Regions:
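Conserved hydrophobic "DFG−1" position in protein kinase catalytic cores
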Residues: 57-59
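Positively charged, aromatic-enriched patches within helix-turn-helix-type DNA-binding elements
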Residues: 1-53
Length: 59
């Protein structure tokens, strides 16, 4: 919690280091997670975007 991760690190952790797709798959799946766990997905409180870097989990 509180540590920002770059998209590439998330991609590697979830899909494995041998995934050869676009890192935008992370953005798509973050959006899907927000739809499931956030009360207001357009104003997230749990999964925060760190612009130009990646994402941060806010516990």
């Amino acid at each position: 919690p509180g540590v920002a991760l770059v998209r590439e690190k998330i991609l590697e952790g979830v899909w494995g280091e041998h995934y050869f797709g676009d890192v935008k798959i992370v953005d798509v799946n973050i959006r899907r997670l927000r739809m499931k766990i956030e009360d207001e997905p357009s104003a997230p409180k749990h999964i925060l975007t760190v612009w130009g870097y990646g994402y941060r989990w806010n516990a």
